[in-house]
Regions:
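Functional cores that coordinate and move charged inorganic groups
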Residues: 1-73
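Accessory, non-catalytic peripheral segments of nucleic-acid enzymes
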Residues: 56-178
């Protein structure tokens, strides 16, 4: 026996001794939540028995979410270079000729967070520029999301606290005189 359900978008296969159940997935990812290879299942049968189920990749464009750690970046420019390196790796992993629609997500605690946050429009343009430089025909940037965070502030020692309190006291004295 063989059961196939076609409207489930993720390909899944269960093979039991007396029954095969297949969700062949969809032929083409239609949005960023449908990443990776898409296609169909070619089912070979001999009389009343399934002998082989072969996945076929049929999509003409891949959706990808590119998670880029910018934790090592100290500057805006270093973060952009890290994205470029990740785009290059993605491009190398794609089947020959396949284009990709890419959502980039920069994440991690980084010294560059404030610069990235302040220059988000430029960040998007820089990422698009990286994609165009690598392969304008195969990489399309759908969106660039900033999910980074600032580095944790280091705890102040007693001397730093004392200096900070003295500065605050001086500011209060000046404010009282005005």
């Amino acid at each position: 026996q063989y059961w196939a359900l076609g409207h489930v978008h993720e390909q899944q296969l269960w093979a039991y001794p007396d029954c095969t159940i297949a969700f062949p997935g969809n032929l083409q990812g239609r949005h960023v939540r449908e990443t990776g290879a898409r296609g169909a299942l070619l089912v070979h049968a001999d009389d009343d028995r399934i002998t082989q189920v072969q996945p076929l990749e049929l999509d003409v464009l891949r959706w990808a979410v590119l998670e880029v750690s910018v934790a090592e970046a100290d500057t805006f420019e270093q973060a952009v270079r890290l994205v470029g390196q990740s785009l290059q790796q993605l491009l190398a992993a794609l089947p020959d000729g396949h284009p990709a629609a890419v959502r980039g997500r920069l994440q991690g605690a980084t010294a560059a967070h404030a610069a990235l946050l302040a220059r988000q429009s430029q960040l998007r343009q820089e990422v698009i520029g990286q994609a165009v430089a690598l392969d304008a025909d195969r990489l399309w940037i759908e969106k660039v999301q900033l999910a980074s965070s600032p580095l944790e502030r280091q705890a102040l020692d007693d001397a730093d606290w004392q200096d900070t309190l003295q500065e605050l006291d001086q500011l209060m004295q000046v404010a009282a005189q005005d």
